[in-house]
Every structure is written in C-alpha cells, then in structure tokens.
From Swiss-Prot:
Keywords: Acetylation, Electron transport, Membrane, Mitochondrion, Mitochondrion inner membrane, Respiratory chain, Transmembrane, Transmembrane helix, Transport
Protein name: NADH dehydrogenase [ubiquinone] 1 alpha subcomplex subunit 3
Subcellular compartments: Mitochondrion inner membrane
Annotated positions of the N-acetylalanine modification: A2
Signal peptide: none
Amino acid sequence: MAARVGAFLRNTWDKEPVLVVSFVIGGLAVILPPLSPYFKYSIMINKATPYNYPVPVRDDGNMPDMPSHPQDPQGPSLEWLKKL
C-alpha cells in the first residue's frame, strides 16, 4: 500500500508539481493553526469579546439591565491579556 502511494506521489510530482505544491500548502494551512501557540489566545480573546455592544439609550429609570454609561465594564475581564 505504501509503495502504491509513493508511486502515485512520485508520478503526480513528475506530471503536475504545481498541483502537488498547492495541495501541500493547503493541507498545512488546515493542520498548522491548531498547533500554533497563538491559537489558544485567539480563542480566549474571541470568547471575551462581546457580540453586541451597548447602544446609548435614554434611561427612564425603569431599565435595571441597562448600564449607566456605555463604557461601563461588563462581561469577562481582559486583564490576563495585559499581563502577557
């Protein structure tokens, strides 16, 4: 089986080296990002980033879930990112 795969790869490399290189680059692009040390931090940043940002609204005094100011800190802290 390995001999057949090796023969196929050798034959393909002889006929179409550009396709082989493009498939290798594409395969590495899929495989390598999870192995990167930055992958962990990008996941942590994406979890801490809010999907919706506060919009200034007129407070009539009957909105307990609205922050008093749009820039009030809410959600998970990013202090771990500042300490890197």
